Design a protein with these regions (language model features):
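Glycine-rich phosphate-binding loop of ATP-dependent small-molecule kinases
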Residues: 1-221
Length: 221
């Protein structure tokens, strides 16, 4: 089973992806994780990606597509995969269709976690990360015991540049402009399943279960 997970920055895709991968025995393929690892290592690909991300723009197709194609061909993806963060544009989706056709595969379902803009901004601008251990906090949902100090290691908490109000609004704008045509594409192909992402995490996953239980042999009953 191949599932695509769509949703704006801050929609909670990462959390839901973990639940989905565990429940349905799918390999979680996160382009965000792959890109962040490349940036941290300072690879050529990482440097290119960082330039775009720092501006609040999307990473170019040719960079992302190559990563995803290679990842999907690895052995752990042969029994099923969950694509998180890709495709983001109709062009990427068309390329993915070609890649999957060459592999004798196809998309089974596209989950779209729909969250209001107000909620997205609240979630993203409140995020804080520990400089030392990487632990993540949120000023509203998961605040540290002492302001700007990590509960786990005592390190300093900071706001990532791409979590600032200005960059967040730009990220959402870019997402809407580039990804909404993609949503229309999958709706027309009758592969799109909207999920109300404004709800609590457990309620969001319950909606997803109702969709995927009808499609997967690995739902666990």
């Amino acid at each position: 089973m191949l599932v695509i997970l769509l949703g704006a920055p801050g929609a909670g895709k990462g959390t839901q992806a973990e639940y989905i991968a565990d429940r349905y025995k799918l390999t979680h393929v996160s382009t965000g994780d792959i890109l962040r690892a490349s940036i941290k290592k300072g690879t050529e690909l990482g440097k290119k990606a960082k330039e775009y991300l720092d501006r609040g723009d999307l990473v170019p197709d040719e960079v992302v597509v190559k990563i995803v194609e290679e990842r999907l061909k690895e052995p752990d993806c042969q029994t099923g995969a969950l694509l998180d963060g890709f495709p983001r544009t109709v062009e990427q989706a068309d390329t993915l269709d070609q890649v999957l056709a060459d592999m004798g595969s196809d998309v089974d379902a596209v989950l779209y976690i729909d969250v209001s803009e107000e909620e997205l901004i609240s979630r993203l601008t409140g995020r804080r990360i520990c400089r030392d251990c990487g632990a993540t906090y949120h000023l509203k949902f998961n605040p540290p015991q002492v302001r700007n100090v990590c509960d786990q290691c005592g390190g300093e908490l900071y706001q990532r540049e791409d979590d600032s109000m200005e960059t967040v609004k730009q990220r959402i704008k870019v997402y809407r402009e580039q990804t909404e045509p993609l949503i229309d594409k999958y709706r027309k192909k009758e592969l799109l399943y909207p999920v109300d992402g404004d709800k609590e995490i457990e309620q969001v996953f319950k909606q997803i279960e109702e969709i995927l239980d009808q499609k997967s042999p690995n739902s666990g009953g």
